[in-house]
Amino acid sequence: ISTGDIFRANLKNGTDLGKQAQSFMDRGELVPDSVTNEMVRDRLGNSDAANGFLLDGFPRNTNQAQVLDQILADKKMPLDAVLELKIDNAEIIKRLSGRRACRGCGGTSHVEFEKPKIVGVCDKCQGALYQREDDKEEVIARRLEIYAEQTEPIITFYNSKAVSYTHLRAHET
């Protein structure tokens, strides 16, 4: 379950939480915890999460980790493991800034790794491809700064708990 997907679904559906998140996402800033936590709580209430789930992009700070602990306690579910995928910042920027989304079907391609047959045109539906605001290089760079400031401390948080914590090099993924 990706927080990015949760945000985009809330935006597409015009929810109050989605509207609150929009301006932060466009600037590459983290959506405030109060909004993010509520979106995640709502999403984890769906039936497909009843027997377990894998979260992508959450928690991003110790406050969110504490809220996740409470959500799991309310659901009477354990936290089985934490995985951290590490990759060089230059590679992150290259991968994200080259990503293109389709205005028609929502599919994605990449200017280098998954080139469409016709530049700027989706292979699936022939819709127009565009670069999302949060995939622009300057926005990605800001997101990486925020990651270093706010997300890295949760490594300490989870290392202090009896939770399996695994660090994986993700450069070949």
Residue ranges: model-predicted function:
Residues 100, 152, 162-163:
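S-adenosyl-L-methionine-dependent methyltransferase catalytic core, i.e., the SAM/SAH-binding region
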Residues 51-52, 163-165:
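Residue-level preference for the first positions of well-ordered beta-strands
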Residues 158:
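Major-groove DNA-recognition helix of helix-turn-helix-type DNA-binding domains
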Residues 1-77, 88-91, 101, 132:
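ATP-dependent small-molecule kinase phosphotransfer cores
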Residues 1, 81-83, 165:
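Hydrophobic/aromatic beta-strand patches that form the interior of the parallel beta-sheet core
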Residues 23-24, 73-149:
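A glycine- and Lys/Arg-enriched "phosphate-lid" helix/loop adjacent to the NTP-binding pocket
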Residues 166-173:
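Conserved small/polar residues in nucleotide/adenosyl-binding loops
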